[in-house]
Amino acid sequence: MSDIKVSVIIPVYNGGQAFKKCLYDVMNQTLKDIEIICVDDGSTDESAQIISQAALEDSRIQYVYQNNQGAAVARNKGMEYATGEYVSFLDADDFYEAEMLEKAYINSVKHDVDICIFRGNKYDASSHQYLSMDYALRFHEIPCNPFTYKDISDNVFHFCVGWAWDKLYRRQFIIDEKLSFQNLRTSNDLFFVFSSLVKAKKIYALNELLIHHRVNDSLSLSVTREKSWNCFYLAANALKQELERIGKYHEVEKSFVNWYVHFSFWNLDTIEGDAYKKVYELIKYEILPSLHLEQYPAGFLSTNYVKRVFDVQSYDCDEYVYEQFFKLRKKAKQKSDDGAKRIKNSKTYKVGKIVLFIPLHIKKWLKRRKK
C-alpha cells in the first residue's frame, strides 16, 4: 500500500494569482502525507512558473504538462500519476481550510467509504463576500450517515451538486469502476460525480465547511457557457445511458427525471445571448420528449416544474419569453404594491405623517395669511 494518503489533482489553465493561493493552501494542509499533481493544460501565463517555484519549496509537487485539452482530460491525466489511498480533484481558483484534507481523510478511513462529501461556501471575487451554499449538500435529505444511493434513491441527484471538488474519492474505487471525466468544455464532472454516487458501496457526508468556491471570476469557463451551451445535455444523456447500462436507472428514475428537468431549466435561466433560444429548443424538442413525462403518475414530477414544462410544451421561444416577461412584471408590481401597503401601515410611516403634518399645516396657514 502507498504511503501517500491523498493524491491532490489540480488542473490549471492560466490560473494566475488565484491558482497560487490554491496551490499554497494545499501545500499548507495539516495532512502532510499527500502528493500534489498539477496538470498544466497549456497555460500561457505565469502558471508554469508558479508550479516550478512551489516545487522548489515542496518536493511533494509534481508538474505535468499537456497541450490545451480542457480540465476533464487534465484530471484524467492526473489520475495516471496518482498513487494515494484517496484522491481529491480541486479547481485551481478555489481555496481551502487548512484541515480540509485531514478531516476528509480521517472520516473516510473511519467510516470505510468510497466517497466523502463536505461543505463549502461561495467567495464572490467581485464583492469579496462569502455567501452560503447550503444547496450543495442538503443534510436534511440524508436519512442515515454513512449511506448508499439506495437510502436516498428518490434524491440521489438532488442532495448534492454534481461537481468533484467538495468530495474525496477512494482511488481503488475509481480504478475498479473505470470512472473518468467526460471531455466536455463545461459540465465535464457531472457524469463522473453522479455515476460514482450510484456505484459507491458507501458514502459519508461531513458536516464541516472546508472549501471556498470562487465565483464571478472573469477567467472562469462557467461565465462563458454560451460557447458550450449543449454540454449539460451531452453530460446528462451519458449519465442516463450509464445508469441503464448498469441496470440501476429504474431505481433512481424519479430522482433523475426531476433533476434533469430542474437542471435543464437552470441552464436556460442562466444562459444569455443567442444560446438562449438554442437551449430552449433543445429542452422543447429533445429533452422533454425523451423523458416521456406523460407516462408518470400525478406527483412524480415536482410541482415546481409542472407549469414550466406545460409552458415550454405549449409555446415557441418568443411566446415563452413574452409570457415569462409579463409574469415577472406582474410579480414585481405585486411586490411593489405589497411593499407600499406595508410601508403605509407601518408605525414609522404613521409617525412620519404626524410629524410632517404640523409643518405642512403651518406652511399652508402662512400662505393663506400672505394672500
Predicted feature descriptions by range:
Residues I4-S7, E35, F191:
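Cell-envelope/extracellular polymer assembly enzymes that use nucleotide-activated donors
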Residues A71, A92-N207, H213-W229:
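Donor-binding/catalytic cores of nucleotide-activated saccharide
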Residues V87:
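Short aromatic/hydrophobic "clamp" motif used to bind/position activated sugar donors
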Residues E208-D217, S222-E251, W266, T270-L293:
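Catalytic core of nucleotide-sugar-dependent glycosyltransferases
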Residues F310-K371:
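Boundary detector for helix-to-coil junctions that initiate low-complexity/charged tails
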